Regions:
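Nucleotide-activated chemistry modules centered on ATP-dependent adenylation/adenylyltransferase
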Residues: 1-217
Length: 217
């Protein structure tokens, strides 16, 4: 039986990394690439604030082709939808069978993605649905929402110390948007990515740690 050809929605963080790992262990799927939305004004991963250079290094460490979906800044819902639907229409013509997402719990997000693909022959796949992902890779906290999570955690390692220090009420996987991560090593990579932590800045109501390639420091 032929494997399903799939592409993975890649955020640069832990959930998409673990979704990749589950696919790598499966005999049902052939991973043909990853795709990511990038803020064209800053050349950074949307929401996570990770540099495109590091995004490319992740793809190289995984041995997978990367498709960048550029979105403007600021980006309206209409502009975002236009960019995503353009990508979907393009890959639907390339023999791709499905798109994989690392969503865990939120039904509304899952329904939104299913609706996006409903008119195509692409299948939406959720390989992590309902699974906890507390300790899955070596990651750094790239972004925090200071309304939910202390600013001091930006640039912190995602480890037992970090999890123990989280205030009550914060999801340990950051599934309510409390924080976002960058994966620099893990079972899904062929080799680790050398990084360092640069400036920590506050922008648009979020606190971002500028994660740098090690040689840039």
């Amino acid at each position: 039986m032929a494997k399903q050809r799939v592409m993975l929605s890649w955020s640069s963080g832990k959930d998409s990394a673990w979704a990749l790992h589950t696919l790598q262990q499966s005999c049902e799927y052939a991973i043909v690439g990853i795709f990511t939305t990038v803020n064209v004004a800053f050349q950074r991963v949307a929401m996570h604030g990770v540099r495109v250079e590091l995004l490319k290094r992740q793809a190289e460490a995984m041995g997978l082709p990367l498709t960048v979906i550029e979105i403007p800044y600021p980006c309206s819902n209409v502009e975002y939808e236009h960019a995503i639907m353009g990508f979907i229409e393009d890959i639907a013509q390339q023999g791709i069978d499905g798109l994989v997402f690392g969503d865990l719990f939120f039904e509304d997000i899952r329904c939104y993605r299913e609706k996006q693909l409903a008119y195509t022959e692409l299948s939406p796949l959720f390989s992590l649905w309902g699974m906890p992902t507390d300790a899955l890779a070596n990651t750094m906290i790239a972004c925090v929402d200071p309304k939910q999570c202390p600013k001091k955690f930006a640039g912190h390692e995602f480890n037992a110390e970090f999890l123990a220090a989280l205030p009550d009420g914060i999801d340990r996987c950051g599934e309510n948007g409390e924080f976002h991560t960058f994966v620099y090593d893990g079972r899904m990579f062929n080799y680790p990515i050398d990084i360092s932590i640069g400036e920590v800045v506050e922008r648009d109501g979020f606190v971002f740690a500028d994660i740098l390639p090690a040689e840039n420091t």
